[in-house]
Amino acid sequence: KYMIMIICSLFVGTIAMQHLAESGIIITDQMPFGWDNPLFGKELGLNWDTILPEATKKLESDGYKLFSAIVSMMFFSGVLKSLAGPAPNYDCQKILSTKSPEEASKMSGFISIILLPIRYFMVMGLCVLGILFFKDLALSHHADGINFESIMPAVINKYLPTGLVGLVLAGFLGAFMSNFSGTLNAGQAYIVNDIYLKYFNPNAERKQIINMGYLSGIVMVILGIGLGLLIKDVNMIFNIITAGLYGGFVCANVLKWYWWRFNANGYFYGMLFGIIASAIPPALSVTGITNYFDGTRMLYFFPIFIVIQLIACILGSYAAPATNKETLIKFYKDVRPWGFWKPIHDEIALTEPTIEKNKNFKTNMLNVFLGITGQILLTLLPMYLILSKWTSLGIVLALFFVIVLIMRKTWWKRLTDY
């Protein structure tokens, strides 16, 4: 599947570069000033009024005008999600399938290196083709004007060779099915193992377990299809996932690493109240009760979801006894987390005076900063390549090479450290 996507991406990007070269058009002259600049100010700063007024309306209706606030919220949520570690879905399954923590770190790092350039080579290729031939595309319209989400299928249908169209669609379907099946399988496992077997039927027979797996899968698929029919556009999906779903569980998954007093009771109530709070805005939006949360406004409520979940986590944790000391001591000795673990560290020090705290916080934060910068550069790399902006491409490559050299010393050679 991934090889198909690589082939498709290379073909699409190459076709875009060929059309751009043959047209003789300097694409930045056709776009608002600053379009090719990855930096931005308080607002997005792209004036589409004289080029495509419908684009201005779309950006305003989707809430992307105050771009700095959106990026700040996304960065804040991204930091929390990174602190939370692998999400409790198929991401966690991938991590657990590796042989060691060192291999898990390498696998996680290589995903960005392999995935980002290939993905955005295709994305930028489709973008360039859409810009070059925008006036020739048979785009659909709705009440608010042009349906911009019809640009990509129109470009694929009209400007890619027939055989390549089939390959691209096969790649898209393959990517969808792998993501869908991975998420579905993880959901079924949680429902069957953590709910059905633990609380309802601990002595269930094999056939009962299989049937419950089938039933839970069918219910999730039906709910997913129903939600899909209510979704208005891609922007709504983005906001539901970023602000809603992640906002519902991120705080509980952060605390489990950094606070010794956190327990299963706190995790349960944190997840419960977090998901309920974060599900209300999407539910009101998709059901048409109100359009207040349309656009990116839902993203601004992310801190509120975090506060609600944090309070629920703390109260829930103190409402039940702490996790037994043997488990906490074993976890601390194996993982050596930084954070609020002083009582556990002091207790271990009574019998093991040589035990040291994790002193790699500053190095870890440096690696996080370098990693984020490196991922941004990997995203820019194929974009500048397709646009034939060789100076910008050279700067990106040079910066990425410097980051690789630094992280080779601060990350790669220290993967076995705590």
Stretches found by the model and what they are:
Residues 1-418:
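Membrane-embedded helix-loop-helix hairpins and adjacent transmembrane boundary segments
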